[in-house]
C-alpha cells in the first residue's frame, strides 16, 4: 500500500469505520497534526474521546466514534487561502451553510474556518469534515 499522507490515512480510517458502524477506530501512525485535527473534531462533537497509545514506535490513537460524522477528508495540495477567499472554499467543500467545518493550519495553530475568521488569520487548508 502506498502511503499518500498520514492525515489522509487517518481520516480515511475514520470514514470507513463510521460507514461500517464501528464504535471505535485505531489510527496509526500518530502525528501532531492528526491530534490537533481530532481535537477540533472533538470540540464540535463529531467524535468522542480519543487517547494516544505510546508503543515506543510511531504511536497509535484510539478514537471513540459517536456516529455523527458523514464525511471527512484531506485537501491536497494544501492551498494558501486568504481571508477573503475563505468563503469560496467553504461553499465548494461543505454541503450546506452552518453545517460542517473547513480546517486550516495558520500561524496561530490548527483551527476551523469560523475560528480563523474570528481571529482574523489565514493559512493553508488541510481538510474538512461534516
UniProtKB/Swiss-Prot annotation:
Keyword terms: Cytoplasm, Ribonucleoprotein, Ribosomal protein
A GO CC term assigned to this protein in UniProt: cytosolic small ribosomal subunit
Annotated Pfam families: Ribosomal_S8 (PF00410)
UniProt cross-references to SUPFAM superfamilies, sorted A to Z: Ribosomal protein S8
Gene Ontology biological process terms from the UniProt entry: translation
Main subcellular location of this protein, as a coarse class: cytoplasm
Keyword Ribonucleoprotein: yes
Compartments in which it is found: Cytoplasm
Recorded GO MF terms: structural constituent of ribosome
The keyword Ribonucleoprotein belongs to this UniProt entry's keyword annotation: yes
Known partners and oligomeric status: Component of the small ribosomal subunit (SSU). Mature N.crassa ribosomes consist of a small (40S) and a large (60S) subunit. The 40S small subunit contains 1 molecule of ribosomal RNA (18S rRNA) and at least 32 different proteins. The large 60S subunit contains 3 rRNA molecules (26S, 5.8S and 5S rRNA) and at least 42 different proteins.
Task performed by this protein: Component of the ribosome, a large ribonucleoprotein complex responsible for the synthesis of proteins in the cell. The small ribosomal subunit (SSU) binds messenger RNAs (mRNAs) and translates the encoded message by selecting cognate aminoacyl-transfer RNA (tRNA) molecules. The large subunit (LSU) contains the ribosomal catalytic site termed the peptidyl transferase center (PTC), which catalyzes the formation of peptide bonds, thereby polymerizing the amino acids delivered by tRNAs into a polypeptide chain.
Family the entry assigns: Belongs to the universal ribosomal protein uS8 family.
Protein's name according to its UniProt entry: Small ribosomal subunit protein uS8
Taxonomic path: Eukaryota, Fungi, Dikarya, Ascomycota, Pezizomycotina
